[in-house]
């Protein structure tokens, strides 16, 4: 039976960072201690209708190719005050920010960066919910692709 406690060679953690810098130099901040997160990549489909043969009544075919790539980030967490201020301001201003999604491998105390995606993103949703009882409120964020691409870079960010 496999050792499920050994996370070496397994994507074990996603780190979501936002460049909150106001000058030319980046100020990467961990979005929050997101305990439930996802990075979703999709690709649209492009179709072209072509006539398969010449002549009246000729059959028509639809050819499909890969279209533009898109992505979204979603997560839920209890927010630290600094992260809440950053996300609240981002939602109010509505601008694009650089987003970095780092894929880590290994145990939470010895994480090794496998690689990361980095590109412009737009904060589309920020909702905060207070559960019943004495539980801590949690925030849900939804970030979507901004202008440009989000290329993959192997290894740890510089």
Regions found by a protein language model. Give the residues of each.
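Short, acidic/charged, Gly/Pro-enriched secondary-structure junctions
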Residues: 84-120
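Solvent-exposed edge beta-strands and adjacent loop segments
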Residues: 2-79, 120-137
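Mixed-charge, glycine-accented linear interaction segment located at domain edges/termini
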Residues: 118-158
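Polar, enzyme-active/binding microenvironments
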Residues: 20-23, 107-112, 153-156
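Residues within well-ordered beta-strands of beta-sheet-rich folds
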Residues: 74, 102, 142-144
């Amino acid at each position: 039976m496999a050792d499920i406690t050994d996370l070496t060679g397994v994507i074990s953690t996603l780190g979501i960072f936002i460049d909150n810098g106001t000058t030319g130099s980046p100020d990467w901040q961990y979005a929050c201690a997101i305990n439930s997160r996802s990075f979703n990549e999709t690709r649209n489909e492009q179709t072209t209708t072509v006539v398969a043969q010449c002549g009246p009544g000729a059959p028509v075919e639809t050819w499909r190719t890969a279209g533009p790539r898109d992505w979204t980030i979603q997560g839920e967490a209890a927010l630290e005050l600094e992260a809440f201020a950053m996300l609240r301001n981002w939602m109010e201003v509505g601008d694009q920010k650089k987003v970095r999604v780092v894929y880590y491998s290994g145990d939470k105390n010895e994480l090794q960066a496998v690689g990361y995606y980095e590109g412009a993103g737009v904060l589309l949703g920020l909702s905060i919910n207070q559960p019943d009882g004495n539980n801590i409120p949690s925030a849900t964020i939804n970030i979507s692709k901004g202008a440009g691409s989000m290329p993959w870079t192997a290894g740890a960010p510089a």
